[in-house]
């Protein structure tokens, strides 16, 4: 957009500097694992505690590389679900999700707020000691559902509005 033409893109270190004490930043990696050595330098130079930084990616190889090269920070695999039109089956199944999380040594799952996420899904993940984060939750009823399920966090486009609707302060 023209009104932002002269704006400078902040560096990752500059973004890290905006994270308040006790809060977390989710760093989504959109490319492949070739970025991890540079990310490692940025993370190691950050004035944040390791527990404040969480890497997320749809690319399982990125998560595996982060867990190997930067084991001090959490890395969550991102996934969404597709339905087979012929069988009606959804994939990945919870079994496939857990197998992938184990294979790549992920710290947890960050997934879309799908109807598949139910008590059994959460129990299966918790049984394996994985975190669960959901996106994009912009409606109070959906937020209440995922809060009741006990997810670790939700991602929303309307944080202030949603907190007010849920009477969270």
Predicted ranges, named:
Residues 1-83, 104-116, 126-128:
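Metal-dependent phosphodiesterase/phospholipase catalytic core, i.e.
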Residues 2-9, 85-169:
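C-terminal active-site rim and adjoining tail of enzyme catalytic domains
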């Amino acid at each position: 957009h023209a009104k932002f033409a002269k704006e400078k893109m902040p560096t990752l270190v500059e973004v890290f500097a905006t994270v308040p004490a006790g809060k977390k930043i989710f760093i989504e990696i959109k490319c492949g694992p070739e970025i991890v050595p540079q990310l490692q330098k940025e993370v190691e130079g950050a004035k944040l505690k390791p527990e404040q930084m969480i890497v997320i990616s749809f690319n399982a190889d990125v998560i595996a590389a982060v867990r190997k090269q930067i084991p001090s920070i959490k890395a969550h695999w991102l996934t969404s679900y597709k339905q087979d039109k012929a069988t009606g089956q959804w994939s990945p199944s919870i079994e496939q999700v857990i197998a992938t999380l184990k294979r790549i040594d992920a710290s947890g799952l960050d997934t879309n707020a799908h109807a598949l996420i139910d008590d059994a899904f959460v129990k299966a993940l918790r049984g394996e000691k994985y975190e669960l984060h959901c996106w994009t939750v912009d409606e109070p009823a959906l937020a209440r559902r995922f809060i009741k399920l006990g997810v670790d966090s939700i991602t929303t486009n309307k944080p202030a509005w949603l907190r007010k609707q849920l009477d969270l302060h």
